[in-house]
Amino acid sequence: MDATIRLEESWKAVLGGEFRHGYMAELKRFLLEEKQQGRQIFPRGVEYFRALDLTPLDRVRVVILGQDPYHGDGQAHGLCFSVRPGVRTPPSLVNIYKELQEDLGIPPARHGFLESWARQGVLLLNSVLTVERGRAASHQGRGWERFTDAVIRAVNEQAQPVVFMLWGSYAQRKAAFVDRSRHLVLTAPHPSPLSAHAGFFGCRHFSKANAFLTSKGLDPIDWRLPEDPPLAVERQMAPNC
């Protein structure tokens, strides 16, 4: 699998060994069989590792964990909670924007494209990196979880302090091993409409993250998003290109 994988160099240095394990060969076999049977997989193959490509290991300042990619047409592009330009903002992200506004006074963006966060050092990582079209959680238990565990371990072992935003019990269990003596671990219910009112609203994770980063001599995250994604980005991200 590693012969055909494009992975950002700092991540390749610490994760290259994962591609030599049998579970990754099994995962590759599964994905190939799914495609051969005519099943559509989201996101595109070149975007499986998009979160790692945009946020090199030595630049990670914040980690936000998701579960698996959006399974609707044109949504997923490799960053958790984020959708392509021109796609309606999903309900969980709408609630994230509401909390941002309450916390930092940032008006909700008119789009759901979070790439500018990733480029600043926010690792927007799903636990499972692929999904079958129209079938939520269809690729769970196929090996991605082991790979993304290795990603989180690599971040945890970095000397630079990092903020982990763990929303919902799934994310909190997955990152339970993070060293809280070095990193800031923020927990809250998931921003889903089903749970946001149980404690996500009012958690103020965004201001807490920036206060922690500043206290460690690190640049805070600019959580404001561009008013509109550049047209060139929209063309590049078109799902059928």
Curated annotation (Swiss-Prot):
GO CC list: cytoplasm
| A GO biological process held by the record | base-excision repair, AP site formation via deaminated base removal
Q: Which residues form the active site?
A: D68 (proton acceptor)
Q: Which UniProt keywords apply?
A: Cytoplasm, DNA damage, DNA repair, Hydrolase
Q: Recorded GO terms, molecular function? A: uracil DNA N-glycosylase activity
Q: Which residues form a coiled coil?
A: none
**InterPro entries per the record?**
UDG_fam1, Ura-DNA_Glyclase_AS, Uracil-DNA_glycosylase-like, Uracil-DNA_glycosylase-like_sf
Q: What Gene3D superfamilies does the entry give? A: Uracil-DNA glycosylase-like domain (3.40.470.10)
Q: What subcellular locations does the record give?
A: Cytoplasm
Indicate yes or no for the key word Cytoplasm: yes
The EC code for this enzyme is 3.2.2.27
Query: Do you know which SUPFAM superfamilies this protein is assigned to?
Result: Uracil-DNA glycosylase-like
- What reaction does this catalyse? Hydrolyzes single-stranded DNA or mismatched double-stranded DNA and polynucleotides, releasing free uracil
Instruction: Enumerate the transmembrane spans.
Output: none
Where does this chain mainly localize?
cytoplasm
The EC class name is hydrolase
PANTHER family per the UniProt record, alphabetical: URACIL-DNA GLYCOSYLASE
Query: Which HAMAP family does the record cross-reference, listed alphabetically?
Result: UDG (MF_00148)
Give the protein's biological function.
Excises uracil residues from the DNA which can arise as a result of misincorporation of dUMP residues by DNA polymerase or due to deamination of cytosine.
**NCBIfam families cross-referenced by the UniProt entry:** PRK05254.1-1, PRK05254.1-2, PRK05254.1-4, PRK05254.1-5, ung
Q: Which family is this protein grouped under?
A: Belongs to the uracil-DNA glycosylase (UDG) superfamily. UNG family.
Q: Specify the protein name.
A: Uracil-DNA glycosylase
- What organism is listed for this UniProt entry? Rhizobium meliloti (strain 1021)
